[in-house]
């Protein structure tokens, strides 16, 4: 059965990173005795924050904003990790460039020339820009949720 790779990645992230955030927000909502609507909003807020965090973390791994970035640049590529940027490239790159990226990922190489090549493939096809836009969509969703939370009922009792 064929699945959309982006939907698959979203489901993986839903079960991993966003789960951590979602659960902490659910605990907060429970402590505040949030009504059902507020509880659902807090859960969704945690999920959106978790998804945004995961995607931006993957992006910073291949395109850090400072030299002092604590992770080794492109370590996800060296580990053969399939990220949102990789899936976007596989959907839009020509066969040769997609095959080149897959080859580098499968090699689990630490060769800096190969890693720069992989990052270059992601840049030239706009995957990093599109991933950043997806982060923006998650953050916009967070803002919408937050703006509605003030209208919800909490029955906090110390």
What are these regions (language model features)?
Residues 1-158:
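All-alpha prenyltransferase/terpene-synthase fold signal
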């Amino acid at each position: 059965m064929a699945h959309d790779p982006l939907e698959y990645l979203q489901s993986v992230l839903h079960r991993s990173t966003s789960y951590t955030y979602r659960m902490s927000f659910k605990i907060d909502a429970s402590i505040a005795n949030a009504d059902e609507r507020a509880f659902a909003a807090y859960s969704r807020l945690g999920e959106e924050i978790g998804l945004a965090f995961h995607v931006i973390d993957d992006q910073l791994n291949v395109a850090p904003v400072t030299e002092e970035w604590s992770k080794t640049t492109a370590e996800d590529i060296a580990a053969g990790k399939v990220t949102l940027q990789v899936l976007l490239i596989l959907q839009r790159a020509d066969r040769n460039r997609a095959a080149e990226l897959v080859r580098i990922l499968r090699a689990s190489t630490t060769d800096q020339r190969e890693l720069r090549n992989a990052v270059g493939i992601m840049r030239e096809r706009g995957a990093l820009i599109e991933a950043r836009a997806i982060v923006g969509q998650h953050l916009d969703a967070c803002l919408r949720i937050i703006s509605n939370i003030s209208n919800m009922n909490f029955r906090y009792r110390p």
